């Protein structure tokens, strides 16, 4: 089914459509293809209009807008982060996004992005690990077994070949949930009783916790030589997971430094501390992993270009699978300068028909 060319119509991907699209494509294929699109955009990083996301912070959480443009397309995401939401039966993170034509300003796509954000976050993490983890990595510890954990596991298996998972969460029901959800894909799963137990023998350590506080999830004694740390949980000022000692021992890689200095684990460090931008590793301008004993860390906070890539990717997919609704979103008067006349014509249609 082609997308309707009518000017009032914007294709809309609902939650139901997104889930069905992911399943029709296949979760592993979706993650692998999405990672490839993210890498394409990272490799043309300099052409993008970039800025730290605009956030409204409160004691309960944060609401943010994440915009970017490559000069032809413009995309933004609305996203929140409210760690206490789960106690009220709500998601910690919800999101939606828009992709628009820069030439005329018209939206080309409106999409749910709660599920899509989980997928793009996991795809980006695994993509970073492809460059930063040891090539023979097979075991990953996941500290924090909430909504993002299964997506991380699937992405690391699809892209890096991770086979064994060591899971820990202070909420044991979350660990049981994660292990149960991942039994089908064929992982070797160990449910652990502590961070120290979870990191034993891990090639990759993923931290993906939700509490909005300065926390030390990963301490110096948890990290041995050669480990790659995938630090995902940091996403706002005042929220950290990694100890200062671990930060100082690691070679740190980030998406967009002006944003990561505000929201990532590196907010604990002086701004003079060296960090490397991930796109520069992909293009060969900077080095990533240089030895088997090197400790690498991806301080991931999420950046708008990843959402831009995700919106581009799903827009290309929806016509193949007919996974969208035509949304009457834009006013389209017969004469572009006669918007008021459009209102009057609607009023006329609503008038009761005279009976002669």
Swiss-Prot record:
Keywords: Amino-acid biosynthesis, Lyase, NAD, Plasmid
InterPro entries listed in its UniProt record: NAD(P)-bd_dom_sf, ODC_Mu_crystall, ODC_N
Disulfides per UniProt: none
SUPFAM superfamilies: NAD(P)-binding Rossmann-fold domains
Biological processes annotated in GO: L-proline biosynthetic process
Known regulation of activity: Is inhibited by L-proline and L-lysine. Is not activated by small concentrations of L-arginine, and is even inhibited by about 50% at 0.5 mM L-arginine.
Active site, renumbered: 235
Coiled-coil residues: none
Thermal dependence: Optimum temperature is 30-35 degrees Celsius.
A molecular function (GO) term: ornithine cyclodeaminase activity
Enzyme kind, highest EC tier: lyase
Amino-acid positions noted as binding L-ornithine in the UniProt annotation, renumbered to this chain: 53, 77, 120, 235, 301
Catalytic activity annotation: L-ornithine = L-proline + NH4(+)
Cofactor(s) demanded: NAD(+)
Pathway note: Amino-acid biosynthesis; L-proline biosynthesis; L-proline from L-ornithine: step 1/1
Upregulation: Is induced by octopine. Is part of the occ operon.
EC number of the protein: 4.3.1.12
Record-listed NAD(+) binding positions: 92, 120, 147-148, 169, 209, 232-235, 239, 300
Signal peptide (residue range): none
Keyword flag NAD: yes
pH dependence (record): Optimum pH is 8.0-8.5.
Function: Catalyzes the conversion of L-ornithine into L-proline with release of ammonia. Is involved in the utilization of octopine, a catabolic pathway that proceeds through L-arginine and L-ornithine to L-proline. Octopine is a predominant opine in plant cells transformed with Ti plasmid pTiAch5.
NCBIfam families per record: PRK07589.1
Record family assignment: Belongs to the ornithine cyclodeaminase/mu-crystallin family.
Protein name, as recorded: Ornithine cyclodeaminase
Species of the source: Agrobacterium tumefaciens (strain Ach5)
Gene this chain is encoded by: ocd
